[in-house]
Protein backbone atom coordinates (compact mmCIF):
# COMPACT_ATOMS: atom_id res chain seq x y z
CA UNK A 1 0.00 0.00 0.00
CA UNK A 2 1.08 3.56 -0.59
CA UNK A 3 -0.20 7.11 -0.38
CA UNK A 4 2.60 8.47 -2.55
CA UNK A 5 1.65 9.54 -6.06
CA UNK A 6 3.45 7.84 -8.92
CA UNK A 7 2.92 6.85 -12.54
CA UNK A 8 1.62 3.28 -12.44
CA UNK A 9 0.76 3.07 -16.14
CA UNK A 10 1.95 5.33 -18.93
CA UNK A 11 -0.69 7.69 -20.28
CA UNK A 12 0.11 6.73 -23.87
CA UNK A 13 -0.48 3.04 -23.12
CA UNK A 14 -3.89 3.70 -21.59
CA UNK A 15 -4.84 6.01 -24.45
CA UNK A 16 -3.74 3.39 -27.00
CA UNK A 17 -6.11 0.86 -25.39
CA UNK A 18 -8.91 3.41 -25.34
CA UNK A 19 -8.40 4.23 -29.02
CA UNK A 20 -8.61 0.52 -29.81
CA UNK A 21 -11.84 0.29 -27.84
CA UNK A 22 -13.29 3.23 -29.75
CA UNK A 23 -12.63 1.40 -33.03
CA UNK A 24 -14.78 -1.51 -31.88
CA UNK A 25 -17.57 0.28 -30.05
CA UNK A 26 -19.07 3.65 -29.34
CA UNK A 27 -21.89 2.28 -27.20
CA UNK A 28 -21.06 3.92 -23.90
CA UNK A 29 -22.43 6.89 -22.03
CA UNK A 30 -19.47 7.87 -19.91
CA UNK A 31 -15.74 7.21 -19.47
CA UNK A 32 -15.02 6.36 -15.85
CA UNK A 33 -11.55 6.52 -14.33
CA UNK A 34 -11.48 4.21 -11.31
CA UNK A 35 -8.10 2.48 -11.29
CA UNK A 36 -7.18 -0.78 -9.59
CA UNK A 37 -6.76 1.25 -6.44
CA UNK A 38 -7.26 4.95 -5.75
CA UNK A 39 -7.03 6.85 -9.07
CA UNK A 40 -5.71 10.07 -7.52
CA UNK A 41 -2.53 8.15 -6.62
CA UNK A 42 -1.68 8.24 -10.32
CA UNK A 43 0.70 11.15 -10.85
CA UNK A 44 -0.46 11.40 -14.47
CA UNK A 45 -4.19 11.55 -13.64
CA UNK A 46 -4.69 15.08 -14.93
CA UNK A 47 -2.80 14.33 -18.14
CA UNK A 48 -4.89 11.18 -18.63
CA UNK A 49 -8.23 12.94 -18.15
CA UNK A 50 -7.28 15.67 -20.63
CA UNK A 51 -6.16 13.05 -23.17
CA UNK A 52 -9.39 11.05 -22.78
CA UNK A 53 -11.53 14.16 -23.25
CA UNK A 54 -9.70 14.93 -26.49
CA UNK A 55 -10.84 11.58 -27.92
CA UNK A 56 -14.53 11.58 -27.04
CA UNK A 57 -17.44 13.90 -26.51
CA UNK A 58 -18.75 11.63 -23.75
CA UNK A 59 -18.21 12.90 -20.18
CA UNK A 60 -15.13 11.73 -18.31
CA UNK A 61 -15.69 10.90 -14.63
CA UNK A 62 -13.32 10.10 -11.78
CA UNK A 63 -14.38 8.03 -8.77
CA UNK A 64 -12.24 8.77 -5.71
CA UNK A 65 -12.16 8.07 -1.99
CA UNK A 66 -11.04 11.67 -1.55
CA UNK A 67 -8.06 10.79 0.64
CA UNK A 68 -5.65 12.94 -1.38
CA UNK A 69 -7.87 15.97 -1.87
CA UNK A 70 -5.76 17.79 0.69
CA UNK A 71 -3.15 18.03 -2.10
CA UNK A 72 -3.74 21.20 -4.20
CA UNK A 73 -2.26 19.46 -7.25
CA UNK A 74 -4.79 16.63 -7.00
CA UNK A 75 -7.65 19.12 -6.74
CA UNK A 76 -6.37 20.98 -9.79
CA UNK A 77 -6.09 17.81 -11.85
CA UNK A 78 -9.58 16.63 -10.91
CA UNK A 79 -10.99 19.91 -12.19
CA UNK A 80 -10.31 18.64 -15.73
CA UNK A 81 -12.93 15.89 -15.30
CA UNK A 82 -16.56 16.42 -16.31
CA UNK A 83 -17.76 14.54 -13.24
CA UNK A 84 -16.13 13.69 -9.92
CA UNK A 85 -17.60 11.20 -7.45
CA UNK A 86 -15.85 11.49 -4.07
CA UNK A 87 -16.83 9.55 -0.97
CA UNK A 88 -17.42 10.83 2.55
CA UNK A 89 -17.79 7.79 4.79
CA UNK A 90 -16.75 9.33 8.10
CA UNK A 91 -17.17 12.45 10.18
CA UNK A 92 -14.07 12.14 12.39
CA UNK A 93 -10.73 10.33 12.56
CA UNK A 94 -12.06 7.44 14.66
CA UNK A 95 -14.82 6.53 12.22
CA UNK A 96 -12.46 7.03 9.28
CA UNK A 97 -10.07 4.44 10.73
CA UNK A 98 -12.90 1.94 11.18
CA UNK A 99 -14.36 2.29 7.69
CA UNK A 100 -11.71 3.60 5.30
CA UNK A 101 -8.58 2.44 7.14
CA UNK A 102 -6.52 5.39 5.84
CA UNK A 103 -2.92 4.58 5.01
CA UNK A 104 0.00 6.29 6.72
CA UNK A 105 -0.47 9.81 8.05
CA UNK A 106 -3.72 10.71 6.27
CA UNK A 107 -5.86 12.72 8.71
CA UNK A 108 -9.62 13.03 8.39
CA UNK A 109 -9.60 16.76 9.15
CA UNK A 110 -7.13 17.44 6.33
CA UNK A 111 -9.02 15.15 3.96
CA UNK A 112 -12.34 16.88 4.67
CA UNK A 113 -10.83 20.35 4.34
CA UNK A 114 -9.46 19.31 0.95
CA UNK A 115 -12.87 17.97 -0.07
CA UNK A 116 -14.51 21.21 1.00
CA UNK A 117 -12.06 23.31 -0.99
CA UNK A 118 -12.52 21.12 -4.02
CA UNK A 119 -16.33 21.21 -3.98
CA UNK A 120 -16.24 25.00 -3.99
CA UNK A 121 -13.68 25.33 -6.81
CA UNK A 122 -14.97 22.55 -9.06
CA UNK A 123 -17.28 23.59 -11.89
CA UNK A 124 -18.29 20.15 -13.15
CA UNK A 125 -20.89 17.69 -11.89
CA UNK A 126 -20.11 16.49 -8.35
CA UNK A 127 -21.87 13.43 -6.94
CA UNK A 128 -21.05 12.69 -3.32
CA UNK A 129 -21.40 9.22 -1.81
CA UNK A 130 -21.68 8.20 1.84
CA UNK A 131 -21.17 4.54 2.68
CA UNK A 132 -23.23 3.63 5.74
CA UNK A 133 -22.09 0.62 7.76
CA UNK A 134 -24.26 -1.04 10.38
CA UNK A 135 -23.21 -0.18 13.92
CA UNK A 136 -20.45 2.22 12.88
CA UNK A 137 -21.85 5.32 11.18
CA UNK A 138 -25.58 4.64 10.73
CA UNK A 139 -27.02 5.71 14.10
CA UNK A 140 -29.00 8.91 14.55
CA UNK A 141 -26.07 10.82 16.07
CA UNK A 142 -23.82 9.87 13.14
CA UNK A 143 -26.40 10.94 10.57
CA UNK A 144 -26.77 14.31 12.28
CA UNK A 145 -22.98 14.76 12.23
CA UNK A 146 -22.96 14.01 8.51
CA UNK A 147 -25.72 16.58 8.12
CA UNK A 148 -23.52 19.26 9.66
CA UNK A 149 -20.56 18.39 7.42
CA UNK A 150 -22.71 18.42 4.29
CA UNK A 151 -23.68 22.03 4.99
CA UNK A 152 -20.06 22.98 4.27
CA UNK A 153 -19.93 21.24 0.90
CA UNK A 154 -21.18 22.13 -2.57
CA UNK A 155 -22.46 19.15 -4.55
CA UNK A 156 -25.08 18.20 -7.13
CA UNK A 157 -26.20 14.81 -5.81
CA UNK A 158 -25.81 12.78 -2.66
CA UNK A 159 -25.93 8.99 -2.82
CA UNK A 160 -26.27 6.82 0.26
CA UNK A 161 -24.84 3.35 -0.04
CA UNK A 162 -24.21 0.32 2.14
CA UNK A 163 -21.84 -2.64 1.56
CA UNK A 164 -23.35 -5.01 -1.00
CA UNK A 165 -20.14 -6.75 -2.08
CA UNK A 166 -17.98 -8.95 0.17
CA UNK A 167 -16.11 -6.48 2.40
CA UNK A 168 -12.63 -6.94 3.87
CA UNK A 169 -14.13 -7.64 7.29
CA UNK A 170 -16.65 -10.48 7.75
CA UNK A 171 -18.61 -8.65 10.46
CA UNK A 172 -19.42 -5.63 8.27
CA UNK A 173 -23.17 -5.65 7.60
CA UNK A 174 -25.69 -3.68 5.57
CA UNK A 175 -27.74 -1.09 7.39
CA UNK A 176 -31.41 -1.73 8.09
CA UNK A 177 -34.10 -0.28 5.85
CA UNK A 178 -35.24 1.85 8.77
CA UNK A 179 -31.78 3.36 9.26
CA UNK A 180 -31.35 3.95 5.55
CA UNK A 181 -34.76 5.60 5.30
CA UNK A 182 -33.88 7.92 8.20
CA UNK A 183 -30.58 8.85 6.54
CA UNK A 184 -32.30 9.55 3.21
CA UNK A 185 -34.92 11.77 4.83
CA UNK A 186 -32.42 13.61 7.04
CA UNK A 187 -29.64 14.13 4.52
CA UNK A 188 -31.76 14.52 1.42
CA UNK A 189 -29.83 11.82 -0.38
CA UNK A 190 -30.69 9.06 -2.82
CA UNK A 191 -30.48 5.49 -1.55
CA UNK A 192 -28.68 3.14 -3.91
CA UNK A 193 -31.00 0.18 -4.11
CA UNK A 194 -29.82 -2.69 -1.93
CA UNK A 195 -30.05 -6.22 -3.24
CA UNK A 196 -29.25 -8.62 -0.42
CA UNK A 197 -30.45 -11.97 0.76
CA UNK A 198 -28.08 -12.53 3.65
CA UNK A 199 -24.96 -12.29 1.49
CA UNK A 200 -23.18 -9.39 -0.17
CA UNK A 201 -23.67 -9.02 -3.88
CA UNK A 202 -24.58 -6.46 -6.50
CA UNK A 203 -25.99 -6.43 -10.01
Enumerate the language-model features and the residues they cover.
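Short Fe-S-cluster ligation motifs
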Residues: 13-36, 195
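Conserved AdoMet/S-adenosylmethionine-binding subsite of the radical SAM
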Residues: 40-175
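Short acidic, glycine/proline-enriched helix-loop-strand junctions
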Residues: 128, 168-200
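Canonical Radical SAM [4Fe-4S] cluster-binding loop centered on the CxxxCxxC motif
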Residues: 1-13
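Short amphipathic alpha-helical segments at helix-loop
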Residues: 2-3, 33, 96-99
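Class I S-adenosyl-L-methionine
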Residues: 19, 53, 151, 181-188
